[in-house]
Amino acid sequence: METNFLRGNPSISQKVGKDNVFRNFYGDTIVFALDDIVKEKLAEYVELLYQSAPECFCERLVPHTFHVTLHDLSNAPVLRDVAEELFENELKVIEKREEIQKQENEIIKMKSKYIFNMVDTSLVLRLYPVDEGEYRRLMDLYSLFDTVKKLSYPFTPHITLAHYDRNRNA
């Protein structure tokens, strides 16, 4: 009997080709930008990952793309498959413009203690707010975008460090 639990999540093929190079991927994910110093430190962590286990990962993420994911509104590997939804989401976000602008320049302080496997597609740095006040601010902002499109999975603040090798254990 063959088991598939070591084969990884097949959804990785939406973002990573058979050659382990990133494919085009379209969407309107809501993200927080990171300071350059944070991106530099993350790049050091990623370097250690690739030195320690290069066979585990696909092409490296470029450090300037590191970000904190707040909400994945819509995404797909083919633009025409998601274009209408992107447009509809944009209209809904425009309707919430004033609410969003109230929080636009605020900084939400976060911490991290560990790296973990995110749905068997990637290795991520798990984040959490430093206190209850920051938690409330984060969840208020998340809830605002969740009214644009409700997600079917729990909110997990994170920074993606590396995507797994698409062909591992194939």
Which residue ranges define each predicted feature?
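Histidine-dependent nucleotide/RNA phosphoesterase domain, centered on the 2H-phosphoesterase fold
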Residues: 1-170
